[in-house]
Amino acid sequence: MTLKDLKIGKSAVIKTVGGKGALRQHFLDMGMIPGAEVTVVKFAPMGDPMELQVHGYELTLRLAEAEQIEIEQIPRRSNSHKRIEALSDAAHPGLGEEGKYHSKKDEHPLPEDTMLTYALVGNQNCGKTTLFNQLTGSNQHVGNFPGVTVDRKTGTIKGHPNTEITDLPGIYSMSPYSSEEIVSRNFVLESKPKAIINIVDATNIERNLYLTMQLLEMDIPMVVALNMMDEVVGNQGSIDVNMMEALLGVPVIPISAAKNEGVDELVKHALHIAKYQERPLRQDFCDKNDHEGSVHRCIHAVMHLIEDHAVQADIPARFAATKAIEGDPLVLEKLKLDTNESEMLEHIVQQMETERQVDRSAAIADMRFDFIERLCEQTVVKPKESKERIRSEKIDRLLTGKYTAIPCFIGIMVLVFYLTFNVIGAWLQSLLEMGIDKVSELADAALTAAHVNSAMHSLVIDGIFTGVGSVLSFLPIIVTLFFFLSLMEDSGYIARVAFVMDKLLRKIGLSGRSIVPMLIGFGCTVPAVMATRTLTSERDRKMTILLTPFMSCTAKLPIYSFFVSSFFPKKGGLIMAGLYLLGILVGILVAFLYNGTLFKGDPVPFVMELPNYRLPGAKNVTQLLWEKAKDFLQRAFSVILLATMVVWFLQSFDLHLNLVKDSSDSILALVAGCLAPVFKPLGLGDWRICTALISGFMAKESVVSTLEVLFAGSITSVLTPLAAASLLAFSLLYTPCVAAIASVKRELGGRWAAFVVLWQCTIAWIVAWVVHLIGGIW
């Protein structure tokens, strides 16, 4: 019987885990080990993937992968374990000990001027970035779906200028399954931080401690931060922190990063262990009596075999030994074992597999989870089912229900766009437009009264105020849309969207996880491209990056709003929704093309944790809105202002730098006129349109400011509604801005970046031509 056959609400014990390579290792690291109890929670609305509960947390798995896991419906192995021996030197500090948690006899403090570097390491979605913000005073974005942090972020602990802490991407283990796991592991191994701050989700402690055990093997000073302890206590649970310290051999500090509780004590311990280089007191988790000591003997034999190589490779021996047993290719490559040593390693491991009756990777994973179970038996009083879990289950009945999930998703997105473009955003925009017009009138009157030179007067009023002012008026719409996207992300709903949409996305060759970067793409392409780093497959990552530009970013909203209000004022909401749907439809068609040509093959398995729903924090939402508004304003008064001034100059002077009365005689008309024939079949042969589209490569908002400057408010008398529709279609799909292209170049290289520019322009031209052709027939 396989896991695929298990019914909803039924439990079973895992017998064997099939598959191979990094994916199988990832399953084991996530707790899908022989002997583990697993329960089916539900299936996605379309029957695939499935949601499981294992080791007290929920994760998703496709039926194709579940079919590789054999189960048996028998009682789980006894939870009666041999107690772990406590380490007497690891007692929790008493009052006033200032972070000194064990014997000082071997202390050798680092010089006072030493830079104390820290790696902040933890599972995805455990509160790492929230803690990082509390420690440093930074305002990094915080979300409630796995994979928010996709790059390293560095800061200084408040009040301690000689410190540097790096927030690493969230990982489940130190196995090289995904790019962020490789980034985090390489940072710890190669950058050699003075200490590690390991943040652990106390509400999901068994799964989180799996990473802790691997970090302890790396023999780096470490402090464990038990986050979300307020939720544990609130749900009538408890953790014996003193005992946990004694069993792990490192300081364990209960904290609530969201409430800034316990953070000061954490800082004291972190400073102390780094300064005195107090390394973990326990790195050996194998029981010499477990299964007649087969794993114990194997690990210690391998440690002796590779010890010299580990020293030369600068890898901790214990960590290198367990990774060598697992067959980790990156570690084995660094160890540089000769043929005889490799054969001896294989012989030792095969002997262990024969005695243990499971394969090497499963044996190591089982050793770790067995230790974790014994640790939790002695230290953790599990809370009753949390309020957050109960609330999430009730909400999920509607938002992930078989018949309600997709209608709810469509309804939520329609509501978001309606409120953004027809209610809240539109009302705020009209208020801001009135204010900008009033300021422009006052500036015009002041310049006239001061008898300012006509050219300078034109630059300020017709250039800066008309151009930049028109872009600024769209700030409320952009902020409103980001507000709703932030609510969806912080609440945990976006992770559910990935779960619900996985089967649909698989039909175009993608994984459900790709929905996250694509939804972010509706806000901005730059972070959307970066968010693809959470995808484990290079094929999926490239394909998602190339599809992200088809998701219309908020920078294009000013273009849509400008043309809709000018040409289709009574059909604003309908046309806006139509543009977004057109972008998605074209993206789907292109995905089919990619899947059959450039990126043949199957999408990677869908293994993802579903976090509990949480109420979005007002501080986090406000912070995100401020960041987006600030970014928009900076662009408006830098790139867009510069582009507006350049456009004004080029359309005001001829090649002899004489002020022209007719802009058709200007430098700009001469240059843009060369491109006009390309756009003529689209009904966009006017050189001013070409100029606006070129300026949009710098920043999409510049299209509107350029049109305002060049047409001086008379665009409706020049373009027809059909030409406006064609221009909207082209603006929707043509090349992203230079910042987005730079992010594509950083992720995929220059050739792919150039491909995106040319490909998007080609697609945009074809779609705009079709729109113009169909519109002409009607």
Regions found by a protein language model. Give the residues of each.
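Extended helical scaffolds that flank P-loop GTPase cores
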Residues: 249, 276, 283-453, 659-668
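Hydrophobic core segments of alpha-helical transmembrane domains in multi-pass membrane transport
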Residues: 408-419, 481-486, 564-566, 579-593, ...
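Conserved G1/Walker A P-loop phosphate-binding module
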Residues: 92-173
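Transmembrane helix-loop junctions at the membrane interface of multipass transporters and ion channels
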Residues: 550, 554-577, 739-749, 770-778
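Conserved C-terminal guanine-recognition region of P-loop GTPase G domains, centered on the G4
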Residues: 160, 185-252, 559
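Extended, low-charge hydrophobic alpha-helical regions
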Residues: 355, 362-366, 382, 423-464, ...
